[in-house]
């Protein structure tokens, strides 16, 4: 048994995940009723990641700031600029693609009972209120903006603490990181359960009716992942960005695709940053921050579904309005984590720019929920893998200036 486990652990995690993926698809297509209990593996995996992530973020960020030496360089400014630039360019890409390949949709009912935010002010206010959330409540609800703010404050307060206290925090961080590695090793079983549940519950037929819309959405996200992001990274590191891009997509994007949660993928991203040799003081802050504000996939979803509604209703859009939509979708996407339902419930906000009534806008949200299995998975994979990509690009850019190899 020990020999079998040793051989299993010697197989790379990505290969093990692919094995779980294939088995999950086969079970869902061939024996969905008999294999139904398999779905619980996915729920347990996502639950474990979501449980450990808030504690990990609090301790890592607190420790990084408490142990930060005066004059020690971090790349947070560069990373923030990359996050915002990437999200904006994703919105621009979605707007241009929607004009090049206009798609009309059959509006769906069923989302009228959900309350969307009233405007961009409400979204930003919600984000600000999350900053001053009760720390215990923030941990319980996985409010990463609140967790980050408390971790930063506690870290600053502990800057003057004794070395033994700082060492204790470091030991706690190492212990939680070890737990995270144990959980991530269970990813193949988790992915098996998640992919089984998705196919067995939703089926493939429900998605075929919105094929063109899905093609446009996924096409935009793939374009951002394989063209826009590599271009941004190249401008930063001045060398072939694709090895880094593909590694981030492979080791972060795959798990994010199936967990459909940027928060649950934080431990995966932190582990990948460690493998890439990045500075822990930087990535322990930038990764949870990215899970909150780096939302290129959300910007694509908001812009594409809004313009699909516009084309369905035959509304003419001029260039200035299209530019405003690009900016609005980027700003709204950055606030998506502060809204229950995420990017889909920010669609009525963007629709209001074109005078589309809330009733129709909520029907567009209904369409979003129908295609959510694919849309949300691709969106999360893009969002989460980009967190690591831009964190690495910012640090490698500094290494290039210093003449260090990477």
From Swiss-Prot:
The keyword Transmembrane applies. It catalyses: L-serine(in) + Na(+)(in) = L-serine(out) + Na(+)(out); L-threonine(in) + Na(+)(in) = L-threonine(out) + Na(+)(out). GO terms for molecular function: neutral L-amino acid:sodium symporter activity. GO terms for biological process: serine transport; threonine transport. The chain crosses the membrane at residues 21-41, 45-65, 79-99, 138-158, 179-199, 213-233, 285-305, 313-333, 360-380. Gene3D superfamilies: Sodium:dicarboxylate symporter. One of its GO terms (cellular component) is plasma membrane. Signal peptide: none annotated. Its main location: membrane. Keywords: Amino-acid transport, Cell membrane, Membrane, Symport, Transmembrane, Transmembrane helix, Transport. InterPro entries: Na-dicarboxylate_symporter, Na:dicarbo_symporter_sf, Ser_Thr_transp_SstT. It is found in: Cell membrane. It is a multi-pass membrane protein. Involved in the import of serine and threonine into the cell, with the concomitant import of sodium (symport system). NCBIfam families: PRK13628.1. Belongs to the dicarboxylate/amino acid:cation symporter (DAACS) (TC 2.A.23) family. This is Serine/threonine transporter SstT.
